[in-house]
Amino acid sequence: MLPSVHSRVLAAVALLVFVPMGIEAVRASRNERRQLARGGVQPPDDVHRVMSIAYPGSFLAMLVEGALRGAQPLLVVAAGLIVFASAKLVKWAAIVALGRSWTFRVIVVPGDSLVASGPYRYLRHPNYVGVVGELVGAALMTGAIVTGPVALLGFGFLLWRRIAVEERALLGARR
């Protein structure tokens, strides 16, 4: 028996979410080692550990809700795909602009200059704009009308805390 269209959509969403996430994790880990070897400093109040659970957990919860909720209108799935893909482009543009400085953790190497190219010319934190867009897109694609907003609120709070930590660390490095 062939899997339903809904099952195939959810499988495609899972691949769209978790394959790039794995690639990003490998790149971030490699860059973290490089940054620390160059004398990088991590602030003690970073929320990385919680984010590293909440981020994939949010997508997983949305996929489970989507499986339980059933098929979504194709137009909503398509809109979610467009939002997700656009967000991924913004995020990857930020990753490319940061180069070897991009990590999952806040690591500041004393003496490094602030990146002001790519999307950083227009946005202070384009990577996080991309992350929020990924969550919105996934919520639309899966029909996660409960876990989507909950994930956005919860992860939004974590991002707010993370940005504060990052700003303090960057300000301290420029002194």
Q: What are the language-model segments listed below?
A:
Residues V26-V47, G70-R175:
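Cytosolic-biased juxtamembrane loops and peripheral soluble domains of multi-pass membrane proteins
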Residues A11-L15, P43-R49:
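Alpha-helical transmembrane segments of integral membrane proteins, especially early/N-terminal helices
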Residues R8, E24, R49:
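Aromatic-acidic/polar surface patches that form glycan- and anion
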Residues L15-V19, I53, G57, I82:
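Hydrophobic alpha-helical topogenic segments used for membrane insertion/localization
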Residues M1-S4, D45-V76:
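Long, highly hydrophobic alpha-helical transmembrane signal-anchor segments
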Residues A14-A28:
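N-terminal signal-anchor/start-transfer transmembrane helix
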Residues P3-A11:
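N-terminal membrane topogenic signal
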